[in-house]
């Protein structure tokens, strides 16, 4: 059911990708980039479309005392522990989630889980590019750059990057990092420009599950180490 709703919500994006395929066939890379920019914005308007994670993988140390202070919550298919004062919402991937629709002044954490191989089921064609699990899909997506689009695969992942990336505040000051944490690994796009912090966390576990945590930290109470402590509590629930 979740996968069916996900497909429905991304219909517009798929149509854009089909149009991109037409442009690829009859035009060169420069025209292709211009066409994509007309649909999702350019690097000046949306800098993260031309950003990629820092090369070095970050290995955080978790503050055990802080982790112990977190409050545990159970949701369908996943559990997580978070600080007091945050509203939690479990979501599906859909366009409204990733825009500035949630422009209220409440500290909130949006949660998402996708089962192993979910992205392969949605987009089986990517397996021809050697992408065979959720982590490989997200890795390719995070490294996608509009100014390096040369073919339909490049275009697909840039478009998907625009969909998967929520509001992270001032993108001109945002950063992208990759990390490894015990049996978890992934990427964080974040901005820590006061008065508010934003953290877009894309996490995979050893079983192949994909988790997304979007943290809107009103009042800038969290730092990166706090966010890693929250990530470390992610678990699937059968």
What is the predicted role of each segment?
Residues 2-118, 195, 214-238:
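N-terminal targeting sequences that direct proteins away from the cytosol to non-cytosolic compartments
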Residues 43, 93-211:
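Conserved polar/disulfide-associated segments of primarily extracytoplasmic proteins
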């Amino acid at each position: 059911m979740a996968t069916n709703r996900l497909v429905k919500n991304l219909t517009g994006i798929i149509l854009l990708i089909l149009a991109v395929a037409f442009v690829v066939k009859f035009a060169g890379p420069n025209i292709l980039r211009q066409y994509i920019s007309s649909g999702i914005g350019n690097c000046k308007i949306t800098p993260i479309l031309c950003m990629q994670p820092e090369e070095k993988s970050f290995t955080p140390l978790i503050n055990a005392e802080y982790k112990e202070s977190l409050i545990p919550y159970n949701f369908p298919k996943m559990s997580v522990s978070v600080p007091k004062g945050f509203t939690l919402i479990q979501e599906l991937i859909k366009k409204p989630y990733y825009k500035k629709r949630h422009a209220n002044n409440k500290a909130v954490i949006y949660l998402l889980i996708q089962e192993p191989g979910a992205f392969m089921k949605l987009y089986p064609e990517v397996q021809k590019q050697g992408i065979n699990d959720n982590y490989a899909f997200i890795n390719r997506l995070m490294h996608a750059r509009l100014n390096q689009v040369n073919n339909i695969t490049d275009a697909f992942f840039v478009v998907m990057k625009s969909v998967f990336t929520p509001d992270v505040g001032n993108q001109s000051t945002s950063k992208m990092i990759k990390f490894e944490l015990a049996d978890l690994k992934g990427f964080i796009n974040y901005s820590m420009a006061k008065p508010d912090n934003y953290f877009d966390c894309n996490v995979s576990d050893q079983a192949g599950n994909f988790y997304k945590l979007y943290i809107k930290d009103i009042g800038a109470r969290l730092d990166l180490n706090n966010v890693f402590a929250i990530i470390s509590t992610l678990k699937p629930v059968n």
